[in-house]
Amino acid sequence: MPAPRGLLRATFLVLVAFGLLLHIDFSDATNMTSSTNVPTSTSSRNTVESTTSSEPTTETNMTTARESSVHDARNDEIMKVLAILFYIVTGTSIFSFIAVLIAVVYSSCCKHPGRFRFADEEAVNLLDDTDDSGGSSPFGSGSRRGSQIPAGFCSSSPYQRLETRDWDEEEEASAARERMKHDPENVIYFRKDGNLDTSFVNPNYGRGSPLTIESHLSDNEEDPIRYYVSVYDELTASEMEEPSNSTSWQIPKLMKVAMQPVSLRDPEYD
C-alpha cells in the first residue's frame, strides 16, 4: 500500500543521512587529532635537538597532552550525543512502521461488507410486481402495466426507481431516447420477446452503484423469463448520450452480480 511504502522510504533516507553525519564527524575527529599530534612530535624533536633548557620543553609537552585529552573528551561527548540521536530516530522509525503495519492489517481484515448486498427475498420483492390476488409490492399495486417504484420507497431504500416499457413503434422509441439525452431517468426498456432493449441509468442518482435488471430467455419457450439483478458503477452523462441496442452496448464496470437468477411468472411489459 502507498502509506507503508512511503514511510519505509522516509525511514531509509533518515538513516542514510545520519550515517553520512557520523562519517563526516569521524573524519573531522581524525583530522583534528592528527593535526594536534604534529606539534607534539615537532616539539619533541626540538626538545631532543635543543639542549639549552629542559624546563620549557617539559611544559610544552604537558600543555600539548592536556589539549589532546580535552579534544578527545569533546569527541567522546559528541559521539555519545550522535549515538543517542541515532537510536532515537531508529526506534521511532521502527515503531512507526510497526504501527502502520498493524493498522493496515487491521483495516484489511475488518472491511465492512459492500453497501449493496441483496438477499433473494429482497430480489423477489424488487422484481415481482403483484400476485394474482392483486397484492401490492415495491413497484406499486394492481396491474404490472406501467408499474414503477413509488418515490417514497426510493427515498428510504437503496433500490433504483425503475420503469419498464415496451414500444410498438420505432419512432416512439427514438423520441424517448432523445428525451433521455436531455433529462435521463432510471428506466429499463424491454422488447416483447423479453430481452433487454435499452437501459438508461440516471447519473445523478445517489453516490452508490446503480441497480440494473437484465432479462434472459432460455431455449425452452415454456421456461419463465429469468431476471438477473446486477450492481454496476454509475454512468456519466457522456456515456449515456449514445446508447445502442443490447448486443453492442455494455454498461461500464460491473461492480457485483448480486444474486442468483430470479424467475418471474410474466415479463414486465408496459
Curated annotation (Swiss-Prot):
Superkingdom of the organism of origin: Viruses
UniProt keyword annotation of Manganese present: no
Region listing for Disordered, in residue ranges: 33-70, 129-179
Gene coding for it: UL132
GO cellular component, one term: viral envelope
Keyword Transmembrane tagged: yes
Membrane-topology annotation of the record: Single-pass membrane protein
Glycosylation sites: N31, N61, N245
Low complexity composition bias: residue spans: 33-67, 133-147
Signal peptide coordinates: 1-29
Keywords assigned by UniProt, alphabetized: Glycoprotein, Membrane, Signal, Transmembrane, Transmembrane helix, Viral envelope protein, Virion
The protein's name: Envelope glycoprotein UL132
Record-linked Pfam families: gpUL132 (PF11359)
Predominant location category: virion
